[in-house]
Amino acid sequence: MALPTVAIVGRPNVGKSALFNRIAGERISIVEDVEGVTRDRIYTKAEWLNRQFSIIDTGGIDDVDAPFMEQIKHQADIAMTEADVIVFVVSAKEGITDADEYVAKILYRTHKPVILAVNKVDNPEMRSAIYDFYALGLGDPYPVSSAHGIGTGDVLDAIVDNLPTEAQEESSDIIKFSLIGRPNVGKSSLINAILGEDRVIASPVAGTTRDAIDTTFTDEEGQEFTMIDTAGMRKSGKVYENTEKYSVMRAMRAIDRSDIVLMVLNAEEGIREYDKRIAGFAHEAGKGIVVVVNKWDAIKKDNRTVAQWEADIRDNFQYIPYAPIVFVSAVTKQRLHKLPDVIKQVSQSQNTRIPSAVLNDVVMDAVAINPTPTDKGKRLKIFYATQVSVKPPTFVIFVNEEELMHFSYLRFLENQIRQAFVFEGTPIRLIARKRK
């Protein structure tokens, strides 16, 4: 289920990124072991009082060449479009500026809650400066020192108080997927082609957190799908719609809301860093992944082309060896009919449950093939394994000492489990836990 979203806005040098880092905590500095997989600094998850939410630093999306006021308006537009709660950051040191008033006037138009955070209140003497900010007409100002971590708890309390109530779980029978890729890989053409394949359009469904439109349709076998909207802002976003950082943010939002991600590549352009970055985020988020190579009609081919592309994809996306690859053309409709079946197979893999007895047979056979490692004379002992969840399938392996379970041995066990069962298109998680 999609997390609610909080956007941080404000003019430059008021401390938006510092507040973002405080709210995000240690999550923001995480760099994954897998090459090409890192958390983007403009979008991450946070948690407070047992409520999780996504947080956007709109300042990280700015086009630095754009005029100053245009940058600020862009931030506010993103916040009003994307967010459930807006945190407007100002500076106690500079007081109210023309830019602050400009943003406040834009935010007046939104019906979403706005939390006014007065940053740089670094000592008690500065607290009196916050009262001037009542003039912005945005309610009570919250004194904050991002540099010292003072007042962020109050801002977080206000955020949680204003988050939308947790929605009921959506039907698990509907498969939610999104098409993700760089601008000009043909996502829009693919969407139109998929929806034009004699499908029954049930109804456009308003997005839960913004003015996005998701589309629900049913295939000839009666399976219901929801295609998650990734269209971006419908306002005068202009040039920003195609900027990479904004595109990354939209992709991450769509991935969060999806069960399965169709990673669209352009056969004419090959694989780029952006593609690897987004695929890594989807893998890290535990989503099903299908690699879709579009514009297959537009390139010259011989009997080696498919094999070369497959090898190139496996080499560049080494962390998703489980992802099926489909070569399509939105123009000629080539192989488009295969996509729903591939999506359904991935969904089935995501929801696979393995009986504990069968799983333990596979794990013990794996140990017989490749004995558990030792460290300083002590050997890892595996007692038993059990599956604890699906989407993605997650397995807990109970051992004598968690520290003895090296990641390379976990990877070996994962490979053995994959060989024994069909987990096409989905990551699986293995967690070592000490038996009590």
Swiss-Prot record:
It comes from the Bacteria. The keyword Hydrolase does not apply. GTP 2 binds at residues 181-188, 229-233, 294-297. Residues 4-167, 175-351 form the EngA-type G domain. Residues 352-436 form the KH-like domain. InterPro entries: G_ENGA (IPR031166), GTP-bd (IPR006073), GTPase_Der (IPR016484), KH_dom-like (IPR032859), KH_dom-like_a/b (IPR015946), P-loop_NTPase (IPR027417), Small_GTP-bd (IPR005225). GTP 1 binds at residues 10-17, 57-61, 119-122. Belongs to the TRAFAC class TrmE-Era-EngA-EngB-Septin-like GTPase superfamily. EngA (Der) GTPase family. GTPase that plays an essential role in the late steps of ribosome biogenesis. This is GTPase Der.
